[in-house]
């Protein structure tokens, strides 16, 4: 019988203050920098679940909801919401706070897929406790089916792509 781990046991939380060096030309946090931060946090959740080395395989359903600006803080929360034999899904939400007023807001959400490198690892069962966790875990199979469909489409696309450099014709 396999072990059961709760979503809460995979929870990883990181906080960051937005500095001038984080901003793009629109004076909001550069999206690529934010993606790097959330990938790092999500990887902790993946490792807590698998207790093995995992790599990021996909970043899905990235929703930039509200921008982060200078002197905001952002709190990244991630936890596992489903898994297959060697892959697992991590949900990430980024909560912003305007530090001068204390107002909080949902700034971003995303789902990341990680793959366990060690083929011998047997992933534990996952249990959800809160309403949010139960809702996200309940829809895992739908998201997984959609990802599989998109992977098949991506493979067709990749087969048609040229690897020649256009300037060397």
Q: What residue spans do the PLM features occupy?
A:
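A positional/architectural concept
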Residues: 2-60
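Hydrophobic beta-strand-centered segment that forms part of the acyl-chain substrate-binding groove
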Residues: 5-9, 43-82, 86-88, 105-109
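HotDog/MaoC-like acyl-thioester-processing domains
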Residues: 8, 12-14, 69-70, 81-169
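Hydrophobic residues in beta-strands and at strand termini
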Residues: 18-19, 64, 114-116
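Short histidine-centered beta-strand/loop micro-motifs
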Residues: 25-28, 67, 103-104
């Amino acid at each position: 019988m396999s072990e059961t781990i709760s979503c809460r046991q995979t929870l990883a939380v990181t906080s960051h203050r937005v500095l001038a060096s984080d901003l793009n030309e629109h004076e909001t946090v550069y999206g690529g920098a934010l993606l790097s931060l959330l990938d790092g946090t999500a990887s902790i959740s993946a490792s807590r679940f698998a207790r093995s080395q995992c790599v990021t395989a996909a970043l899905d359903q990235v929703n930039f909801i509200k921008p982060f600006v200078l002197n905001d803080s952002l709190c990244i929360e991630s936890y596992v919401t489903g898994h297959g034999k060697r892959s697992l899904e991590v949900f990430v939400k980024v909560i912003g706070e305007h530090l001068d007023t204390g107002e909080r807001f949902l700034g971003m959400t995303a789902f990341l897929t990680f793959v366990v490198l060690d083929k011998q690892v047997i992933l534990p069962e996952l249990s959800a406790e809160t309403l949010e966790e139960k809702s996200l875990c309940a829809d895992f199979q739908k998201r997984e089916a959609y990802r599989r469909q998109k992977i098949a489409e991506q493979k067709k696309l990749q087969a048609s792509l040229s690897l020649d450099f256009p300037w060397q014709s």
